[in-house]
């Protein structure tokens, strides 16, 4: 059993990981006072992506992008095999640390949370933390009606709006536009080479 007791989980495809992800991780650690934040790249996303980079490449990029004494890059979802469902990741780290973890996701995810695998079980087994994205929350009323009493348990992270997205980075590469400053300098060349294919 691990003795660290304030644990965060920041999962995603990280396709590719970018500076926005790094900012989010730093704010989460500071504002939630986390002892440890796990960065957990998705192995097989529930919703298939045609341009998903191989897990090993995304994992390597995450190790370069995220660093610090309170961060650990986890390959749990690869080791588990199969489709990566957030609930099982939360349950794994909850059992590992004997604590209720903080699960961090983007504000835009709330618009379709009812499509997540056993989403009510997920919300009941973690502190569900949402960071702001560049959107106007047109779905807030819909989300409240879906989650009902669980909506009030959501923690909204007070952090700067993130104007960078992985899909925008991939699009810019296809259009031969610069991504300088959007990803870690040490992975920029590899990211451009991979998504240019």
Curated annotation (Swiss-Prot):
Q: Which gene encodes it?
A: nadD
A GO molecular function held by the record:
ATP binding
- Top EC class per UniProt? transferase
Gene3D superfamilies named among the record's database cross-references: HUPs
Protein name, UniProt field = Probable nicotinate-nucleotide adenylyltransferase
Out of the domains of life, which is the source? Bacteria
Catalysed reaction equations from the record: nicotinate beta-D-ribonucleotide + ATP + H(+) = deamido-NAD(+) + diphosphate
The yes or no answer to whether the keyword ATP-binding is present is yes
* CDD domains to which the protein is assigned, alphabetical: NMNAT (cd02165)
Q: Which NCBIfam families match?
A: nicotinate (nicotinamide) nucleotide adenylyltransferase
């Amino acid at each position: 059993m691990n003795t660290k007791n304030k644990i965060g989980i920041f999962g995603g495809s990280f396709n590719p990981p970018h500076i926005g992800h790094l900012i989010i991780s730093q704010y989460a650690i500071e504002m939630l006072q986390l002892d440890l934040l796990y960065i957990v790249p998705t192995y097989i996303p529930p919703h298939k992506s045609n341009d998903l980079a191989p897990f090993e490449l995304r994992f390597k990029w995450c190790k370069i992008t995220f660093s610090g004494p309170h961060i650990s890059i986890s390959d749990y979802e690869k080791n588990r095999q199969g489709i990566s469902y957030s609930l099982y990741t939360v349950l794994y780290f909850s059992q590992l640390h004997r604590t209720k973890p903080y699960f961090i996701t983007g504000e835009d995810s709330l618009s379709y949370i009812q499509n997540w695998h056993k989403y009510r079980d997920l919300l009941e087994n973690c502190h569900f933390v949402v960071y702001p994205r560049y959107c106007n929350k047109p779905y807030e009323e819909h989300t409240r009606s879906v989650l009902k009493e669980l909506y009030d348990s959501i923690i909204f992270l007070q952090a700067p709006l993130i104007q960078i997205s992985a899909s925008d980075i991939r699009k810019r590469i296809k259009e031969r536009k610069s991504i300088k400053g959007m990803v870690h300098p040490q992975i920029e060349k590899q990211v451009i080479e991979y998504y240019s294919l």
